[in-house]
Curated annotation (Swiss-Prot):
One of its GO terms (cellular component) is cytosol. The lineage of its organism: Eukaryota, Metazoa, Chordata, Craniata, Vertebrata. Optimum pH is 5.5-6. The keyword Transport does not apply. It comes from the Eukaryota. InterPro entries: AlkB-like_sf (IPR037151), FTO (IPR032868), FTO_C (IPR024366), FTO_C_sf (IPR038413), FTO_cat_dom (IPR024367). Fe cation binds at H231, D233, H307. This is Alpha-ketoglutarate-dependent dioxygenase FTO. It comes from Homo sapiens (Human).
Length: 505
């Protein structure tokens, strides 16, 4: 079943088409460090983008981080994601793993990634290999370092803005003079700045361009092959920073003299591209990334600008540290939601039957919405990614089993509601109120089950290795006596809709 694009997706696609039409066969201008106006343009139009050269980071940290990348790659911990874009399933050219606070998730391109936990204070985490545990600890150490650097950069930005200066440091080397906060800097600013740099996850990326011959060409500026297309990072706390550590493996790190006369960027070196969203007047930037360089996107840069990653010739890792918007994306959150939904269940029933305290329409509506949330935002998202997380840790096994048990109880709740709707003697008005309260959720449930089942059976899904193959879970056959309702709700939804239509004058 083809999904209808959202209004936001349609608007974005329309903007893209209009921009390409305006360009016709011409390229927009972009600048690299070889261009005389490169740094001036950076200062004027991209002041919240900061590059910190590799030389400003300690050799010890470089060594630890780069070994951690290679360790995770050796153990097969990074995976290409089967993502959903405008109703189509696509396999990302980049392999990824999410590391971060225990129980956190991060959603991008309609895919919820679950953290391989790093060892935060007070946690007791078991990884499958000691080397994997050590690598996760290293990325927590890098996270702490980048958080400190981000806070410093945000303080410098705040100080300069308050002093009405129109420049921030662009390329901060090891001996860059630090700027302190002015007297107008207050405690609330400090709290705000720290929260914007409170990185709770890092999304690790890896790609070997030699094994990806079909990479897309950058469409607006002619920047060459893209590893990651133009985008804003999704699902982040508003105005929070993003910090990226880049590690391109051994290869040509400097432009050769023969290439110095070439226009545009060196295709052998990885770059990050920046442009102002939907702006065809301001030149874009292509910033070369050498081994161990870090860059920071501060304040609202991620909202006002788009960025892409331009492939070099050598394999590259990156660690992208983010303040993920987790208000609806933690294990604690979804467990609390499940408990809220099940507050309506009577606890004194001895058998497996579910008895409800209330048939108040608002209570039933909330319960069915939570039922959908745990099924489609958590269980199906997790199992669609196969058994990949077991490569690193069993941390999610028990929570997923717990969520599935709670979800199964919610199936019993839905069954109890349907029994009530059919009960003889139930006033017509009350029946209609219940039907109106639950029908939208049940219709969505049926449609989404069909969609997820089809995704798991798709041709591209069948090509994945066994441990990454999507699993349609929960799934059960019609004759499964342990389940109160069928997997396919078509007949039930049709019957309920018919009852509601009959009742209308």
């Amino acid at each position: 079943m083809k999904r209808t694009p959202t209004a936001e997706e349609r608007e974005r696609e329309a903007k893209k088409l209009r921009l390409l039409e305006e360009l016709e066969d011409t390229w927009l201008p972009y600048l690299t460090p070889k261009d005389d106006e490169f740094y001036q343009q950076w200062q004027l139009k991209y002041p919240k983008l900061i590059l910190r050269e590799a030389s400003s980071v300690s050799e010890e940290l470089h060594k630890e981080v780069q070994e951690a990348f290679l360790t995770l790659h050796k153990h097969g911990c990074l995976f290409r994601d089967l993502v959903r874009i405008q109703g189509k399933d696509l396999l990302t050219p980049v392999s990824r793993i999410l590391i971060g606070n225990p129980g956190c998730t991060y959603k991008y391109l309609n895919t919820r990634l679950f953290t391989v936990p790093w060892p935060v204070k007070g946690s007791n985490i078991k990884h499958t290999e000691a080397e994997i545990a050590a690598a996760c600890e290293t990325f927590l150490k890098l996270n702490d370092y980048l958080q400190i650097e981000t806070i410093q950069a945000l303080e410098e930005l705040a100080a300069k803005e308050k002093a009405n200066e129109d420049a921030v440091p662009l390329c901060m080397s090891a001996d860059f003079p630090r700027v302190g906060m002015g007297s107008s800097y207050n405690g609330q600013d400090e709290v705000d700045i720290k929260s914007r740099a409170a990185y709770n996850v890092t999304l690790l990326n890896f790609m070997d361009p030699q094994k990806m011959p079909y990479l897309k060409e950058e469409p607006y500026f002619g920047m060459g092959k893209m590893a990651v297309s133009w985008h804003h990072d999704e699902n982040l706390v508003d105005r929070s920073a993003v910090a990226v550590y880049s590690y391109s493996c051994e290869g040509p790190e400097e432009e050769s003299e023969d290439d110095s006369h070439l226009e545009g960027r060196d295709p052998d070196i990885w770059h990050v591209g920046f442009k102002i969203s939907w702006d065809i007047e301001t030149p874009g930037l292509a910033i070369p990334l050498h081994q161990g360089d870090c860059y920071f996107m501060l304040d609202d840069l991620n909202a006002t600008h788009q960025h892409c990653v331009l492939a070099g010739s050598q394999p590259r890792f990156s660690s992208t540290h983010r303040v993920a918007e987790c208000s609806t994306g933690t294990l604690d959150y979804i467990l609390q939601r499940c408990q809220l939904a099940l507050q309506n269940v009577c606890d004194d029933v001895d058998n497996d039957d579910v008895s409800l305290k209330s048939f108040e329409p608002a209570v039933l509506k909330q319960g069915e919405e939570i039922h959908n949330e745990v099924e489609f935002e958590w269980l199906r998202q997790f199992w669609f990614q196969g058994n990949r997380y077991r490569k690193c840790t069993d941390w999610w096994c028990q929570p997923m089993a717990q969520l599935e048990a709670l979800w199964k109880k919610m199936e019993g709740v839905t069954n109890a509601v349907l029994h009530e709707v059919k009960r003889e003697g139930l006033p017509v008005e009350q029946r209609n109120e219940i039907l109106t309260a639950i029908l939208a959720s049940l219709t969505a449930r049926q449609n989404l089950r069909r969609e997820w089942h089809a995704r798991c059976q798709s041709r591209i899904a069948r090509t994945l290795p066994a441990d990454q193959k999507p699993e349609c879970r929960p799934y059960w056959e019609k004759d499964d006596a342990s389940m109160p309702l069928p997997f396919d709700l078509t007949d039930i939804v049709s019957e309920l809709r018919g009852q509601l239509l009959e009742a209308k004058p």
